[in-house]
């Protein structure tokens, strides 16, 4: 009997060890699993140059993202070219989202383009643009307002160009626009220097009046500034070669940056910023953002040396007083995981 009891005892011990091991493995497996990203309804508002195009492709290749439409405007290129570039990016990414034309000039009736940076077609002048589809007949502003009204509190507008279309939508129907879940803006210098002037970033400089309207609208705005796109976030020549050798999508993106790379090389830099795809990464992958700041953002619209500068009054600083009574109208991205940016983009388009 003692022998049998011993056998039973050891069998129970062995079973318990096995079960505890299985439980541990299961717990480790569960811990290793990431929660699926939530479904996102987005409108991409863009002046489609090479970096905008790469951002559209990133969004279209991200499974949990529903692109409700792409609204285009003048900026890097003229309005018609912006539409064709967006259509081509969607085609390359396998998306049938509609493209809607908006502003052909900024709020002051001017056009500020970037042919010298991105090429005359905005896509490196590499012969890439021959879309099979055409833009929709509905106006971009009408589309924005109709879509926000259809999905109140759900639509996120990802603004990777000047704010002209958004400002026009706010002017036309401010109450509907307040039902926007979030406007994500690739714009401003953040807390660093500018690229259109020492104090201004191109998207804001192209239409500071519209940018001010957006900031003052009462809509939730999160800003990804130019300062997030520098340093380790810049794409190197070696990384462009890797991108080109990945697949057809990667080759398209790499070729579209040829003029921009020439522009940077002329200024002594082998690596380039891809600001719009970095902004899109912030939007789509929350873990990429390491810190944010609550701020009051104020845009200068007057002509002069400070035109289009956006000043950020950060919450908790000495000027944060009862007398100032700031409306903290923006969330400013303060830090991102720059070193992971390129690999995250590469994984998304594979």
Task: State each model region's role.
Residues 23-25:
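Bacterial signal peptide processing site
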Residues 100-131:
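Surface-exposed loop and adjacent secondary-structure segments within mature catalytic domains
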Residues 35-46, 50-88, 127-230:
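Active-site histidine-anchored catalytic micro-motif
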Residues 1-9:
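Bacterial N-terminal signal peptides that target proteins for export
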Residues 99, 214, 280:
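A residue-level signal for conserved active-site and pocket-lining positions in enzyme catalytic cores
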């Amino acid at each position: 009997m003692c022998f049998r009891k011993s056998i039973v005892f050891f069998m129970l011990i062995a079973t318990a060890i096995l079960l505890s091991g299985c439980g541990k493995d299961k717990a480790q497996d569960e811990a290793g699993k990431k929660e699926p990203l939530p479904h996102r309804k987005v409108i991409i508002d863009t002046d489609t140059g090479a970096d905008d195009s790469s951002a559209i492709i990133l969004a279209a290749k991200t499974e949990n993202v529903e692109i409700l439409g792409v609204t285009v405007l003048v900026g890097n290129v003229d309005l018609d070219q912006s539409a064709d570039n967006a259509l081509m990016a969607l085609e390359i990414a396998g998306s049938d989202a509609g493209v809607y034309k908006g502003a052909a000039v900024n709020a002051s009736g001017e056009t500020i383009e970037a042919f010298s940076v991105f090429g005359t077609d905005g896509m490196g002048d590499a012969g890439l643009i021959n879309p099979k589809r055409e833009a929709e007949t509905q106006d971009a502003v009408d589309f924005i307002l109709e879509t926000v009204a259809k999905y109140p509190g759900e639509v996120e507008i990802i603004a990777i160009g000047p704010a002209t279309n958004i400002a026009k939508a706010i002017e036309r129907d401010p109450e509907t626009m307040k039902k926007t879940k979030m406007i994500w803006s690739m714009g401003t210098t953040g807390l660093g220097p500018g690229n259109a002037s020492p104090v201004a970033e191109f998207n804001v400089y192209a239409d500071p009046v519209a940018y001010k309207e957006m900031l003052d609208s009462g809509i939730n705005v999160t800003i990804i500034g130019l300062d997030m796109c520098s340093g380790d976030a810049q794409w190197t020549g070696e990384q462009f070669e890797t991108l080109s050798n990945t697949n057809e999508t990667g080759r398209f993106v790499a070729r579209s940056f040829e003029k921009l790379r020439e522009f940077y090389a002329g200024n002594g830099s082998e690596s380039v910023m891809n600001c719009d795809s970095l902004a899109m990464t912030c939007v789509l992958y929350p873990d990429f953002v390491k810190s944010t700041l609550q701020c009051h953002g104020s845009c200068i619209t007057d002509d002069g040396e400070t035109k289009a500068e956006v000043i950020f009054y950060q919450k908790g600083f000495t000027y944060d007083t009862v007398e100032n009574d700031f409306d903290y109208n923006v969330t400013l991205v303060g830090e991102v995981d720059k070193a992971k940016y390129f690999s995250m983009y590469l994984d998304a388009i594979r």
